[in-house]
Swiss-Prot record:
HAMAP family: Ribosomal_bS16 (MF_00385). One of its GO terms (biological process) is translation. Keywords: Ribonucleoprotein, Ribosomal protein. This is Small ribosomal subunit protein bS16. The lineage of its organism: Bacteria, Bacillati, Bacillota, Bacilli, Lactobacillales. Belongs to the bacterial ribosomal protein bS16 family. It comes from the Bacteria.
Amino acid sequence: MSVKIRLKRMGSKKRPFYRVVVADSRSPRDGRFIEQVGTYNPVTEPAQVTLKEESILNWLNNGAQPSDTVKTLLSNAGIMKQYHEAKYTKK
């Protein structure tokens, strides 16, 4: 089972709102997910992002792969930097 951290589209037509979720890669975009780890609202100015850092770092350490968009959101929040520092300073 390959696990991904990706966006799940919510909201109404022309007013998107996304949940950052951990899901099996085989499940559909808006289908079943394992855990919700944040939200992303691109409609507000500036875009509003909330993330559960501990949960995301735990999933990344267990092998979850973020999608390209989620990787950008995590980098802007500084979570990817924390992950890489923790991963490469253990050795």
